[in-house]
Amino acid sequence: MQRKIAFFDIDGTLTSEVDGSIPASTIRAIREARANGHLMFINTGRCFQNVEQRFRDIGFDGYVCGCGTNIYCDGRDIFYHPQNHETIMAILNAARKTNVDILFESRKEVCFDLTRPLRHPKALYHYEEFKRQGYDMPEDLENPNFFSDKFVIWYESPMQLAAF
């Protein structure tokens, strides 16, 4: 038998777009593929801390997280490449200049730029969700010790996105 590898996104692939549930048939198929010697990975834009336990409990061989900035295989952290402070500052300045809402994520924390009120409904939703779940949410994005794996922006118009 030739061993194969499969990668699954979380949102809308492993989960239902309607209610976020994971179909039992999906869990069975992943476990059966692993039992047959195939490698099963999650490949997600989420940082590892945002991969909920219900996904980990399915039993994957590894995870490609944070848009490829962090890779885990067989329980080991085999690759990690966060953004450096200079890059983060350039991104933060562009977000402030164009008035987009921005979220920086790392495998340890999530950080919104709160120098002005968040405006986009999805940014507000995620901010409240992270707060409700007790995430570490430092506010000093300009601290030289702050680092991030990835960022997300929310914009109100295509022109705003183009300017960013």
How does the language model describe each region?
Residues 27-123:
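Active-site phosphate-binding/coordination module
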